[in-house]
Amino acid sequence: MTELKNDRYLRALLRQPVDVTPVWMMRQAGRYLPEYKATRAQAGDFMSLCKNAELACEVTLQPLRRYPLDAAILFSDILTVPDAMGLGLYFEAGEGPRFTSPVTCKADVDKLPIPDPEDELGYVMNAVRTIRRELKGEVPLIGFSGSPWTLATYMVEGGSSKAFTVIKKMMYADPQALHALLDKLAKSVTLYLNAQIKAGAQAVMIFDTWGGVLTGRDYQQFSLYYMHKIVDGLLRENDGRRVPVTLFTKGGGQWLEAMAETGCDALGLDWTTDIADARRRVGNKVALQGNMDPSMLYAPPARIEEEVATILAGFGHGEGHVFNLGHGIHQDVPLEHAGVFVEAVHRLSEQYHR
């Protein structure tokens, strides 16, 4: 494979020295970019965009042409795995993702296949290979998956949810069925991420978007336990380099110590967690990624720079910080504000790495 020209992101995740703090943005390939909207229109719909390796590659690279980001992230969706299990994923205007046949009981779980990532999810691996080729070693490529718990919420609820009553009913009334589903998902996600790594992903991230809706005990049993299983099963080296793994539970700030025990390399932080506090608690074990409130990008440039400076000072000197937003970038953020953010991270962080 091509020599990596900028490996700041990988080095920071492994708490190795860097010249400046690396930065990328969750959902950096997305609707805030006019060129993304044009490519998506060309594809016809969202899943067609995900399933076309050339177009998925194009949208992955778009933000890198605008901003000096330190990593590219595969353009895909967390729901590719449940889709490959045959649940019939479709998108409803204004409603988000839906499944035609949600999982309602243990019998439904038993029928679910564990998808072969090179077959049913081959389009994702094609995209990874295409992106790696086109990146020409400029920056590393991040692969990702949803966590078993987060994927299960969509599969059991039949789509997005605000109250999670359907999956919580299963969790409390039929825990065996839910554990069976989560176990199958953990196996599927492990295979899926390992296939992404073999195809060329140089780091991977597990997005546990809905872990924060659980009690502490339930989080340990129904979310973290299965993420830990995945971390244990991942290829941690490829192409002569370590492949770092980041866990991100939105709303999971109170569980950082337990998350750090999984053996992952880094933890993603949402904007509700104080990064100085997080570093005090787990900084000797893992790197930290985050954690500016994505809505800060609506603020005037001077205020964005001030916030970047505050977060950098909160983390302080030394290694192990990847700057990011605390969740995905909003679709109506001014393009130049994203540019101000990225530039400020590089310029203002240099003093912390001398």
Swiss-Prot record:
Matching entries from PROSITE patterns are given as: UROD_1, UROD_2
EC numbers for this chain:
4.1.1.37
| Catalytic activity, as annotated | uroporphyrinogen III + 4 H(+) = coproporphyrinogen III + 4 CO2
Q: Where is this site: Transition state stabilizer?
A: D77
Q: Which GO terms describe its cellular component?
A: cytosol
Binding annotation for substrate: R27, Q28, A29, G30, R31, D77, Y154, T209, H327
Q: Which pathway is this protein engaged in?
A: Porphyrin-containing compound metabolism; protoporphyrin-IX biosynthesis; coproporphyrinogen-III from 5-aminolevulinate: step 4/4
Could you tell me one molecular function GO term of this UniProt entry? uroporphyrinogen decarboxylase activity
Q: Which UniProt keywords apply?
A: Cytoplasm, Decarboxylase, Lyase, Porphyrin biosynthesis
**Compartments reported by the entry:** Cytoplasm
Biological processes per GO annotation: protoporphyrinogen IX biosynthetic process from glutamate
Q: Which top-level enzyme class is recorded in the Swiss-Prot or TrEMBL entry?
A: lyase
Instruction: State the superkingdom.
Output: Bacteria
Its biological purpose = Catalyzes the decarboxylation of four acetate groups of uroporphyrinogen-III to yield coproporphyrinogen-III.
Which family does the record claim for this protein?
A: Belongs to the uroporphyrinogen decarboxylase family.
Complex and partners = Homodimer.
Name assigned to this protein: Uroporphyrinogen decarboxylase
